[in-house]
């Protein structure tokens, strides 16, 4: 299977989605280091700027290479050049099934940026990558992520009870799915 590729840059009505680089590490660290962003997204807060740089230089590209994942995007509000969040595919379940994930700085919550960014990536993935299905997981307490999934037309497929989150707390793990055939009628 050839490497999944996406354009370096996408634009939506209010956002620019672009590949993240080490030059973005400081912007990314400002939100990835926040517990209210990191824990609901399933990872511990990034401790140092150096840790974020290492992630961008090594962990992210190695994961993408190993799982044949497209690079994904940083979320930039038009008129700025600052990355305030990310949207990407973080896991390949099968050749034609990817899992989408997203994060956003709390200063930008409640403005509809994540659904707008995810919609652009989902549309591109179904059209250009030939995916059959896109999956999304979130913890039961993450009401914002649940709303994003529902707004984008995902169907709740499973509730896995009493899983541990990134802090070791017991909570439900919700699994959503969106088929290409469902996306085509939206």
Question: Where are the regions that the model predicts?
Answer:
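Short, surface-exposed helix-loop/turn micro-motifs enriched in polar/charged residues
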Residues: 43-44, 67, 96
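Acyl-donor (CoA/ACP) binding surface of acyl/acetyltransferases
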Residues: 1-38, 72-186
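A short helix-loop-beta-strand connector motif used in the catalytic cores of GNAT acetyltransferases and
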Residues: 59-74
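Conserved GNAT-fold acetyl-CoA-binding loop/helix
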Residues: 36-59
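A short hydrophobic/aromatic micro-motif that marks alpha-helical segments and, especially, helix-coil
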Residues: 48-50, 63, 168, 183
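Hydrophobic residues in alpha-helical segments
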Residues: 32, 41, 63-65
